[in-house]
């Protein structure tokens, strides 16, 4: 009987890996098995020992198909996913009937997460890809980095933005002429470089004959318990659509649901997420020092009843100070990668095939999916009304 259990678990693991095209390490990371996870998976798969009941249950519950594989024949519109990260912007547009015909992401760990969840490997550095290599499409999506324009406002042509990643968006808009676009950035973009960066972006989008509007939206207003304010720029091709001078894009106002941190917390959390005595004492000491020096307030502590957390960023993996969770009779703990995924509105069937450190970076760099979903609905509705 014992041998049968080993055979069953080894076959189960092998089948899961084969169906999802996962390496031993990718499956171990996705299951949260820690530093010895890959070795354990390899041993179990080869019939040496077997996982305990808790891990076996995790393996049994694990996906057997690519979670977000798109329908390549039945679709309503097409889009491309630039600076794609792990696909947070893609998910809602695909849900609404869109087909992704091209994606680009340079980070190899994000590429891995993207491939495993969507069944496609993004192209690499967009600066090395010619517009002619990109299929025609209807909507451009991109969460681009905020960079200064060295000569912003001094020229009348497109030299203002050359050498920045926004230039790559501009180049593709000019060459491919999609019907619409959605860009996402940090809310500080508006004030970056004294406002020159934002005004240059909007000026150049206008020069390309796109009607563009921008608005800062807060994730907590869209059903996820995280403040996370971001700026969203929506644009439509004026040469294709008759857009009145007084037109205002109907940015969504939110969904009105009250949020609570407890809604995204896992029930059974590994002790490894509890911060050490040394780190906790350091957090408290720095908080006192920062208050004295007027440099901010240091760590942020939340519990299940808190309406929302502060914004998680790519640096969350370092010490978790942005959002620590209270625990009874213990030091506080960091959010788990799955909790970070939920904080951004990612579905629970989204696979996390990387280490905790990489997962924190990926979700910290990603978007609040529910915000994108509501913007996408408004965009598609407007385009359908015009066509």
Report each predicted region and the residues it spans.
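Recognition helix of helix-turn-helix/homeodomain-like DNA-binding domains
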Residues: 32-50
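DNA major-groove recognition helix of helix-turn-helix/homeodomain DNA-binding modules
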Residues: 48-70
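A short, Lys/Arg-rich alpha-helix, primarily the initiator
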Residues: 1-20
